[in-house]
């Protein structure tokens, strides 16, 4: 279970980064994934190279992908309304309405204190949750917020896999790879059916191990 590993990420230095330039979001590419692909316990055949970065993370720049009819520059489309998806004393999750009723765009806001909130953007697709690690310096408390998000994915969404994605040319890529590998995430091989074709992005996956009694 991911709970037993959460403390590892709480001490990670990857959540205190230097400021980076703006980069295009990866999430629009996730929306283009086929919803018919089975996701249950899929092997990822991950790469084991945790040096400067996997060879498949090419340095060739790629143009940003856009949601058809959308802005594609990390700004929310104002024509999309949002509905409350889930709420408790730590999380408030809203869902952006899309034309695809099998893919959900979730805006997750964690409440660390009454005055401090941290937001994450995720896509729920075919029992998998995709979370983009944003560029730039993350605010203080992001490590605790991410831990709460993982618990939400396991206990409330009951997904099979959690994917994280981040741009391969960020300065802290090697640190991110080490941190999430230690947490239990695996590097996803290129061309895997559960991730979009984005050679400019790195994807890692965590598979939840459930008892047979929980799956019945």
Curated annotation (Swiss-Prot):
It comes from the Eukaryota. One of its GO terms (biological process) is viral translational frameshifting. GO terms for molecular function: ornithine decarboxylase inhibitor activity. InterPro entries: Acyl_CoA_acyltransferase, ODC_AZ, ODC_AZ_sf. GO terms for cellular component: cytoplasm; nucleus. It holds the Pfam family ODC_AZ. Interacts with ODC1 and thereby sterically blocks ODC homodimerization. Ornithine decarboxylase (ODC) antizyme protein that negatively regulates ODC activity and intracellular polyamine biosynthesis and uptake in response to increased intracellular polyamine levels. Binds to ODC monomers, inhibiting the assembly of the functional ODC homodimer, and targets the monomers for ubiquitin-independent proteolytic destruction by the 26S proteasome. Belongs to the ODC antizyme family. This is Ornithine decarboxylase antizyme 1. It comes from Gallus gallus (Chicken). The lineage of its organism: Eukaryota, Metazoa, Chordata, Craniata, Vertebrata. The gene is OAZ.
